[in-house]
Amino acid sequence: MSTTKPICLVPLHVVIVGAGIGGLSAAVALANRGHSVLILESTSELSHVGAGVALPPTTRKWYESEGVLQVDDTACVPLEGIEITKWDTGELVTRTAANPAGKQTAIHHGDMQLALLARARELTNVEIRLGARVVDVDLEATVALLADGQRVAGDLIIAADGVKSTLKAKVCPPEAVVPLPTGEAAYRFTLPRELLESDAELRELVQRPWGVRWDGPSCHVVAYPLRNHRLLNVVLIHPDNGDAKESWTSVTDKQNVLADYQGWNPTLLKLIALAPPEVPNFRMFLYSPAPVWVKGSTILLGDSCHAMLPYLGQGVAQAVEDATAIATVLSLIETRKQLPLALRAYESSRKERVDQIQAATYRAREQLHLRDGDAQAARDSQRKATSGTGQNSDVVKMQQSYWTWDAAGVAEKTLAALIIA
């Protein structure tokens, strides 16, 4: 991504609904380019929720260029690559090192949000209002309507209010808002290094700069270190047994997790045994690609228009690309009359790419969750044959496709073409 931040020619007042990673990323990008930003967040306090996320190298560099993360930030762990193992024996199937685009960076979701919040608060042209719940938007007037009756006007409203977006229904037709259950859920927990030190196998998982993935029938598990190797992040995707909810606060008994992974690799079972008595259990839904991202001067951004399943780890990256694109086009317009063109360029430069990634993410789970048999054996044989060669098709090709995208450059070219037309 381009690190050049052109100062805007037409300063705008932008209202952002939601102080998640997408909303805060957009706020920082816009403020760095000279726009004034008001963030309206429904919660009265930003809690330290979620688990680990893996930032592609372009996303990490973008955060550094925007003053959010430091090159040597201790909240981060640069990952050398990922090791994929057999679900039951733990046999190494393939090892894929970082490709020429760079290394992924592992960081806790809460740490990422707090770093963004700290940067936003450093910027004098950003205001954050907590406990400000937006219930509607007046599309014609570009006014956000709050639960307490307040009306907040702006030149532009960005709906970055997440997977359960209130404002998506104002921009998209009703059928685009209804989520479909995937039949899968995710257990998530983190383990402090102190719990792992006494076991050599577990200690290695947290001290090495590598991710590990176990792929098995209808399930897969990912583990990697966080916070300068002081935490181990563990995510376990499994069939939804009806116990989960679409909420970060939904939990289940640890014994249910152990039962779901009975017969899996003993190293993994030791990790689960160390988990808290109650383990977060998040139900996963499939959200159809939003057919429209822009209506009037209100736009969708991040999960509100393209909520991602976790199979390719693209949720944060695509929200950051959205933030980059909208900040780029708004900083290039020369008159307010060009704002509609800028918003068209934002959607046009982003939608096709995001739709393709959403579809690829859904397809990826089929390869991850193959049952024991010929198809699984063929997959693992191909992985072994390409291990260490840089040609592992299900990892390296994804990196080449997703990790080298120039969201700013594409947005700039799209806007230029619209202006000329």
Curated annotation (Swiss-Prot):
Q: In which pathway does it act?
A: Secondary metabolite biosynthesis; terpenoid biosynthesis
Per the annotation, which location comes first and is thus the protein's main one?
membrane
Class of the enzyme per the UniProt entry, highest EC level: oxidoreductase
Subcellular compartments = Membrane
Q: Where are the transmembrane segments?
A: 9-29
Q: Which SUPFAM superfamilies match?
A: FAD-linked reductases, C-terminal domain (SSF54373), FAD/NAD(P)-binding domain (SSF51905)
> What residues bind FAD, as annotated?
E41, A54, D303, V316
**So what family is this one in?**
Belongs to the paxM FAD-dependent monooxygenase family.
The name under which this protein is listed is: FAD-dependent monooxygenase atnJ
Source organism of the structure: Arthrinium sp
Gene (name only): atnJ
